[in-house]
């Protein structure tokens, strides 16, 4: 730099093209049924409150919105429904689909430990499991008898769409966007979604 023109303490921003000769491809890893609790606080920023039209998921590259639950009470957390299970044969995996032998209900597993939390496929009004069911995991093949079924918070998944955060030239933070015709939630939210975790590297191939 020229001290006469810029002075000795000047800060200069240089914009230019570089050639990187050693680059590594990033790897995506599927992460299923990640949970995000959304509650109102005194200093919450936009995108972090249940009543915001857009709610940030806090990470990029989400690819499926599994479920959104509304506690309908600002003082209590939203919850998924749960199954208390009898003897389990095999090992269930998080995010896999389970099917009820009697009811025909289908759901995604959020937590594999009993009581097993889950999200019904089909959203509000979908057929739920019963105590007559033996559930079977689609990918694991694990089975278990259902001892009891506990209802979760109100399902409001249909009130939102998923913005994956993927843009033409960068990955933005993913978010859920409330539909213009949908009413604002009344309580705290629980959002369940699938996303891709990114490894270290320079680009996606």
What are these regions (language model features)?
Residues 131, 138-144:
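Solvent-exposed, low-complexity segments and loops of surface/extracellular structural proteins
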Residues 1-87, 91-96, 101, 105-128, ...:
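Signature of Asx- and small-polar-rich beta-strand/turn repeats characteristic
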